[in-house]
């Protein structure tokens, strides 16, 4: 046992000597040397918690080691030794040497619960500026435990660390245009997960270059699913539509002639085919096809080739309609079909915004300069018409050209709004009707009250007369309220009531 302790002390002395030599140098240079035999791991009186496996051996491949020699060190921790293929790492912060085990090769017989793999962490120390390669242990449960130079078995390394793994996730960018893949001052247009390069008008992108070509505008009808949204230009469905149209034109004209197809607008419409399914619809796609400048195709041949390809295939395309190139640029028809958009003459109602633009657009709306009088402003009275100087709403121009306020009941532009007048008339009539109804209600109520008072007076009078008759002493009052009592007399039997109508002599006879 004493012999082992003496050997350990000798090893520590040699380590201190190597450490002093390393501190005098400015940098540590590493070279690759082949290690043929295993090195016995050892530790000083400060124990380091490293995984150990008793009575295990492993074949060790060669690893890069430091230039300073490292003698074998006998472990005093236990009776078993741990063979390690890696050379010991000499620390510049303490007097102990920490052997770090690494992974064994395919012939290793080490237990599966022991060390599995080993990655290399490059750590830089802020104190001495030295860089050391420290192997970090990887347990079987995929937990990383990097080793530092301060005799610690876990925790993050000091300084800047770079971890190198064998598997790298090389996923592409989420935005295809973020790396600016388009050259020659072209624009990168993003779709869903792909993109294409767009050049100036009349040019197409080919081999990282914008080349001049012939422009053939038109419209093509394509069958799409019911859920297709033409506004979602970054959707997968829109990307498929762009790819389908591009493939059609590339197959029709060939790669030597075909340049590029640009989608301008996409509009939805009802399907003209009755045999289509209910969940299908078609869209009208306004496109511009650019062919090589040396092509012999014209507008007629281009239309014929495309429609022929549509009829002969069972694709989702319905038909292709040509748009004249001169109409596309807004120019008058020329003999060369407006091949040079900059040289064509604009139509009468259009103008070129600048000499470098091939398109003729509608003239800008400009108000007359003299429209600065009182109660006047620049207005567009007709849809699509030119602006003109007119009176503001509520005023009307007189014979002298001055703006006068509208008459009562009129308002709006040029005093054509009669709403106020109509409202006044209707309100007046409604007021009269309501007032008449109120008066009639009052009269009716007073009439009912007057009739009720007359009946009460008649009842009072009858009661008064009955009381007056009772005071005379007559017991046989007259019938039906008569003040004269009836007297019964006996009439003679011989005398008969004479009917006045029976005396014909005294009565004139009727003449009928």
Swiss-Prot record:
Residues 22-67, 133-176, 493-512 are annotated as: Disordered. InterPro entries: EGF-like_dom, Growth_fac_rcpt_cys_sf, SEA_dom. Keywords: Cell membrane, Disulfide bond, EGF-like domain, Glycoprotein, Membrane, Repeat, Secreted, Signal, Transmembrane, Transmembrane helix. Residues 1-18 form the signal peptide. Residues 443-512 are cytoplasmic. GO terms for biological process: maintenance of gastrointestinal epithelium. The chain crosses the membrane at residues 422-442. Residues 19-421 are extracellular. Residues 53-67 have a biased composition (Low complexity). Cleaved into two subunits, alpha and beta, probably between the first EGF domain and the SEA domain. Beta subunit contains the cytoplasmic tail and alpha subunit the extracellular tail. The homooligomerization into dimers is dependent on intrachain disulfide bonds. It is a single-pass type I membrane protein. GO terms for molecular function: protein homodimerization activity. Its main location: membrane. Glycans are attached at residues 151, 169, 193, 206, 284, 332. Residues 212-336 form the SEA domain. It is found in: Cell membrane; Apical cell membrane; Secreted. Epithelial and hemopoietic transmembrane mucin that may play a role in cell signaling. Homodimer of beta subunits. PANTHER family: HEART DEVELOPMENT PROTEIN WITH EGF-LIKE DOMAINS 1, MUCIN-13. This is Mucin-13. It comes from Homo sapiens.
